[in-house]
Structure formats: C-alpha cells, structure tokens
Swiss-Prot record:
Residues 180-246 form the HMA domain. A metal cation binds at residues 191, 194. Keywords: Metal-binding. Residues 141-165 are annotated as: Disordered. Pfam families: HMA. GO terms for molecular function: metal ion binding. It comes from Arabidopsis thaliana (Mouse-ear cress). PANTHER family: OS08G0405700 PROTEIN, PROTEIN SODIUM POTASSIUM ROOT DEFECTIVE 2. This is Protein SODIUM POTASSIUM ROOT DEFECTIVE 2. The gene is NAKR2. The keyword Metal-binding applies. Signal peptide: none annotated.
Length: 259
C-alpha cells in the first residue's frame, strides 16, 4: 500500500492508516531476517587493538620515487593478499608466493650489483702477494703459468731429488768397487729349526749378497761386503759359531829402513 489513503469518513481513514503501519513494521522485520545476521559491534574480537587495517589503505605517491615505492608496496600487498586468500580457502598453488619471491630476489640482485660497482675499484687497487693462493686465480697469464715469478721453495724441492739420486749412485759405485769377502763359519746346527733361524738372520743382514748352509757339515758360507768379525758376531747372537779356518788378516805394510 503506497501513499496515504483518504477515505470518506475519518474513522475509516484511521483504520487504513493503522493497517499500513502494521504492514510496514512486519516487512522491516522480514527484511532484517532475510538480510542475514547483524554485525555485533560490541564483539571483543572486533574491538581488539591488534587488528590493524593499515594494509587496506594505500597512500597516493607525491613524487616519482614515491610512486615506484608505492608500486612495489602494491605488488607486495597483492602477494600477501593472494597468499592469505589461498590459505583461508585451502587451495593449492603458489602464484602470489612466487611473485613475492621473485620481487625479493630482484631487490637482492640490484643490491649486489650496486655493491660490486662500488667495491670493484678498491679491489682493483689491492695487489695480492705472490705466495698467497689468490695469486694463482688472477687474470694475469704470467701468474698462472709461473714464467715470470717462481717460488724459490718449489725450485729447492725440485732440485732435492736430483741430489739424492747422485748420492745413491755414488753409494752403488763405492759398493761395486769394494772387494766381496767370503767367510766360512762352523755353526752348531742341531735341527732344521736352527737352520731356519740362521737363514732368516743372514737374509736380514746388511751387506750380505749370498750365503750357503751345509746342514750335514754344519758349515755356513757367507759372501758380501762385510768383515769376518762382523759376520761372526752377528751369527753368534743366534747360534754358537766359529771360523772354519783361521781367517787371513792382511798385515800392514811396514817399511824397513836401512841403517
């Protein structure tokens, strides 16, 4: 019933107006029920001070630099909103997270480039010493090949093996020049075990080139660059031994002067 109704009598007009008022009150109640729950402004969650709505408002830029910063903030804001939206809905995918990560990596790359541009001249002025490990990593080809500057310690180490080889050759020549002596000993060999002990001992002796053991005759013949007394003393530590024949000891040459 729209507008006001005017009836012929005042009583009928009052009845119609009262019915119209009742109809309006019922329709407003039904509209409130159909519109959903009313927001409770007295809810403590809504009144919580930690709930900030600063992200919902974006300030307009005042200059070009502020405009770039606001664009970055807008992208970050969009990424955050997309992440929170996906978390709330439970959907998969990381489009917002990927965009945010890409933005962060771009900022890090720009920071590194700016730092390298600033620090490169100072690094170029610093010269690394020759003995350091960074010297080999330089761009100078002479430093890599080592043709200009050589480490004296390395040259000494390279020359050392050559000197050792010379000493070894000298020892071999001296050993070859000396006369090999043959010594015959009589050793108390009671069993094959005693023979094995003497054989092992002679094999370990220095200067012995060859030896022969006659178990039946208890005779041991040793050949090498070693004196008879040294062989006798060495074998006597294992078994009782003595010379088979008295060794001929060379007598010193004594010049007789005529009176």
């Amino acid at each position: 019933m729209k507008g006001r109704m005017f009836c012929a009598s005042q009583a009928s007009t009052a009845i119609c107006s009262s019915m119209d008022h009742v109809h309006k009150s019922t329709t407003t109640d039904e509209d409130e029920r159909n519109s959903g729950r009313a927001i409770d402004r007295h809810n403590p969650i809504i009144k919580d001070g930690r709930r900030s709505f600063a992200d919902d408002f974006i300030k307009l830029p005042t200059s070009a630099e502020d405009g770039e910063m606001s664009n970055k903030k807008l992208e970050i804001y969009k990424g955050r909103r997309s992440i929170t939206g996906r978390r709330s809905t439970g959907g998969g995918g990381g489009g917002g997270a990927a965009a945010l990560l890409k933005l962060i990596t771009n900022d890090i790359g720009l920071a590194r480039k700016s730092f390298s541009c600033v620090a490169r001249p100072a690094c170029d002025l610093i010269k690394t010493p020759v003995g350091s490990t960074r010297y080999l990593l330089g761009s100078d080809p002479d430093s890599i090949t080592g043709s200009v500057d050589q480490d004296p310690a390395k040259t000494v180490e390279a020359e050392a093996p050559a000197g050792e080889d010379k000493t070894l050759t000298e020892k071999k020549t001296t050993c070859g020049d000396t006369d090999q002596q043959v010594v015959v000993l009589k050793v108390s060999l009671h069993c094959r075990g005693c023979e094995g002990k003497v054989r092992k001992h002679l094999a370990r002796m220095q200067g012995v080139t060859s030896f022969n053991i006659d178990f039946a005759a208890k005779k041991v013949t040793v050949t090498g660059d070693i004196t008879p007394l040294e062989i006798l003393d060495s074998i006597s530590k294992v078994k009782n031994a003595q010379f088979w024949t008295n060794p001929t000891i060379p007598k010193p040459n004594v010049e007789t002067q005529n009176p």
